[in-house]
Amino acid sequence: HGLMDVPNNREMTRDNVFIMMSSTKPVLGVAAMMMIEEGLVRPSDPVSKWIPEFADMQVAVLADPVEENISPVSVNSNNLPAYRLVPAAREITVHDILTHTSGLASGGLGSAISNQADRRPPANLETTVPKFGGYVLDFQPGSRWQYSAATALDVIARIVEIESGLPFDQFVQQRIFEPLGMSNTWWNVPPEYQDRRVVIVDRDMSRFFDVPDTTYFSGSYGLNSTADDYLRFEQMLVNGGELFGNRLLSPRTIRMMASDQTNGLYQGISRRV
C-alpha cells in the first residue's frame, strides 16, 4: 500500500528496499547473544578484555558544583558548559553496552566533548572502534539508561568479529540472514536493486543513495532490507529463536532479551520491552 517514491508517484511493492536505520540494532543483539550462548562472551565481561583502549575511561561532569558530579542528559557540542573529568567508577561491560547503560556516546556532555574529535569517515570496525575508548563517557557506567544511537553497539560488533574470526557483515550473513532466507538484506545495496529503494519524503536522499559502498559494517545502523525479509527476522524472535526449522537462539535466550535488564530503567537487550 502507498507510494515508495511520492514525487514520482511510484507505488510501493513487497520487494521495495527500506533504509533500516536503528532496526540494525536487533540484528546485532542476536549476534551478541549467539556469542553469549556459545560461551565466548559473558555479559559481565569488561570491554577491555578485547579492546584495551576501554580500560581507563573518564566521565564528564559539570564544573560546578564541585561537591557534586552532575552529568547533564543533553548538551549541544557547539555550546559546551564548563566541565571537568572524573574517572569512571568501573569499566564498561558488554551488558552495559547492550542495555544502553554504558554512558558511551549517549548524547550527553561526554558525547559533546568527544564530538570535537576526529570526524573522518570510519574505515572499518577494527581500526575505528578502539578510538571510542578515548571518548568521554556521558555518565557513570550502569547509573542511567540513555540511548546510544550510532556508536556504542559497534563495540559489540567488533567483539563479535574478534571472537568469530569473521567480519561482522559476513558473520550475520552466514549465521542470521542465510538461515532465515533473508536474501534482500545488506549494508551495501547491489546495483541491480537500487531502483527498488524507498525514497523518504522531504529528505535529501543523496546522503543515503549517492555514496560509495561502505566497509564499516555498523551494529547500530546501516542495514537495508525489505518488509518480507525483516518480517522473517522478527518472526524468528516471536517463535522463540527458530524459523523454518533453523534455530538461531534458544527460547530461554529470547526471553532474556525481552526481559528488563536495567532494574526498570527502560530496555531489554537491544529490544524495547
Question: What are the language-model segments listed below?
Answer:
Residues 17, 22, 84-87:
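Short gly/ser-rich anion-binding loops that grip negatively charged ligand groups
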Residues 46-273:
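Short, surface-exposed loop or secondary-structure junction motifs
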Residues 28:
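Active/ligand-binding-proximal structured segments within catalytic/core domains
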Residues 1-20, 40-42, 56-68, 208:
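Short, conserved catalytic-motif segment at the N-terminal edge
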